[in-house]
Design a protein with these regions (language model features):
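Hydrophobic, well-ordered secondary-structure elements that form the walls
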Residues: 1, 104, 124, 176, ...
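Extracytoplasmic/lumenal acceptor-recognition loop(s) of multi-pass membrane glycoenzymes
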Residues: 56-79, 93-167, 195, 201-221, ...
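Contiguous transmembrane helix-bundle modules in multi-pass membrane proteins
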Residues: 1-84, 435-480
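Active-site-proximal, structured, solvent-exposed surfaces of multi-pass membrane proteins
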Residues: 245-480
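Structural motif
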Residues: 106-110, 178-181, 293-294
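Membrane-proximal, lumen/periplasm-facing interface regions of secretory-pathway glyco-
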Residues: 64-90, 320-325, 356, 365-373
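Catalytic cores of secreted or luminal carbohydrate-active enzymes
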Residues: 167-175, 180-259, 352-368
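Beta-sheet entry/capping signal
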Residues: 50-59, 101-104, 174-175, 288-290, ...
Length: 480
């Protein structure tokens, strides 16, 4: 046991390499040596407490060092804030008057988003976040590689609510619930032009054309068109998002930032406050800043994180079990009128920021809702469990578009007849629809559900049969 513990500890220490983890594994080595010492004493005195007491002491010390001291334990005040039932009241109040299908999320910094990644307060609260080993690969790929939302956490499977206003609009996040600055009251930000979760449109773009769109058009074009794999689409009227202009930005800090040609070299032993300056004339109106760059980590076994305007991106150490592979950091944010500087926190480490792309535009792309020509109206009496039902009036032939991740077990019926489902917007379920008024039902058939029910029934019958046979044999033995 001692040899195995030491071997694993040394291997982990070699692979991790950074200071905090090195201290933790040194503690494990010390624990192993101490336990081995008391084991030798036990061999002579044969007193159980010689093994039990040192083991308990080591467990407490290691837990304090690895969790408590590192800040991994949830504080009582934080837990009370996270689970405060007042959040439930705020979400309910926001959804009480809502008749459509939309999403509702909680705002906050990365830590708050992490706390609420799988949390809902109401059965009608739909979110964009998920943290599960049984994740949808299409949706995961869309977030990370197609739309390229920020990735604030070490674990690549932890997909939290995004601060990207374009992603929020695309996914139908209509309500964002938060706390006021004094922390006393709740605030509800209503995004009236957010996409319906289900809608009809004839503004179609082929996936082949969409795949040629580079940042930031890979995001903005999804506000103007629905993407399908139909190749025979007349795209002569398709135009790129207007009003997006390239701009120059500069990172400045007191220490640790060096400009090198078209890149910035970061070398800092602790988090460094910095400023991102925009080289442009402000319009006196709100704007959107689109920012993307690659991160070259010179110490790949250490994490790198950069926070810009409260939005965090993190590149995990390659040795991490759930390495996120986030080598391209993307930020999309709204700027207030006349704002030319953005606060930045450069995480500790040695790395290079390169291949930087920066653009600005007005907020028209957020305000335009012409894509959503026909809105789906849910029937809340028929919408429950694994089924969504409602009506839609298509103004012209086109597609039924949803922001429900595509799955082969999803079934769509239009006017009672099953139709062929298609993958739309590269990762979501949809289908073709003709003009007119229709009744739509979307049903999810869980794979293995029927087989599971039959197996459970067979198990119950077998158990009942065994119970009856046992009683019969018991009575027969008593009669002998």
């Amino acid at each position: 046991i001692f040899g195995g513990t030491v071997g694993v500890s040394l291997l982990a220490l070699y692979q991790q390499g950074d200071g905090l983890r090195a201290q933790n594994y040194q503690l494990i080595l010390f624990e192993s040596a101490a336990l081995f010492f008391f084991f030798l004493i036990f061999q002579k005195w044969k007193r159980p407490f010689l093994l039990l007491v040192p083991a308990l002491v080591c467990l407490v010390l290691i837990n304090h060092a690895a969790n408590g001291k590192a800040g991994n334990l949830v504080q009582k005040e934080d837990y009370q804030e996270i689970t405060d039932s007042a959040w439930q009241d705020a979400v309910r109040d926001a959804l009480d008057g809502e008749t459509g299908l939309c999403r509702t999320e909680q705002s906050g910094v990365a830590k708050k988003r992490k706390d609420n990644v799988n949390r809902i307060w109401n059965m009608r609260q739909w979110t964009t976040s998920v943290y599960s080993s049984a994740y949808d690969t299409e949706y995961q790929n869309f977030r990370n590689n197609v739309f390229q939302v920020e990735q604030p956490f070490r674990n690549g499977l932890m997909q939290s609510a995004s601060a990207n206003p374009l992603f929020q609009k695309f996914m139908g996040v209509k309500y964002v619930i938060g706390r006021s600055e004094d922390g006393e009251n709740f605030t509800t930000e209503v995004q009236e032009t957010a996409a319906p979760v289900i809608y009809g449109t004839s503004q179609i773009l082929s996936e082949k054309t969409y795949q040629t769109m580079e940042f930031p058009y890979n995001q903005t074009m999804l506000m103007q068109y629905a993407v399908t794999d139909e190749e025979n689409i007349a795209e002569h009227g398709v135009t790129k998002t207007k009003g997006i202009q390239e701009t120059n930005v500069t990172f400045t800090a007191k220490h640790g930032v060096t400009k090198e040609d078209d890149s910035w070299k970061i070398r800092t032993k602790k988090n460094q406050k910095s400023t991102l300056s925009l080289d442009e004339d402000t319009s006196g109106k709100e704007r959107i800043l689109y920012l993307q760059f690659d991160v070259e980590n010179e110490h790949p076994n250490r994490d790198v994180s950069i926070v810009i305007n409260g939005i965090r991106n993190k590149l995990t150490a390659k040795s991490h079990l759930y390495y996120n592979g986030n080598t391209t950091f993307t930020y999309v944010m709204k700027l207030s009128a006349d704002q030319k500087k953005v606060n930045v926190t450069l995480g500790k480490g040695t790395y290079r920021i390169c291949n930087l792309k920066s653009y600005v535009s007005d907020t028209t792309v957020l305000e335009d809702d012409s894509l959503y020509q026909s809105t789906f109206t849910p029937d809340w009496n028929a919408t429950k469990g694994n089924q969504i039902s409602g009506s839609i009036e298509m103004e012209q032939d086109g597609y039924l578009i949803t922001s429900i991740p595509y799955d082969s077990h999803l079934e769509i019926k239009v006017d009672g007849r099953e139709v062929v489902t298609e993958k739309v917007n590269t990762a979501f379920v949809g289908c073709r629809m003709v003009s007119g008024e229709h009744w739509v039902t979307i049903t999810y058939h869980a794979p293995g559900l029927s087989a599971g029910k039959w197996i459970s029934l067979a198990g119950i019958l077998l158990w009942a049969g065994m119970w009856l046979l046992t009683r019969k044999f018991s009575r027969a033995e008593k009669n002998l």
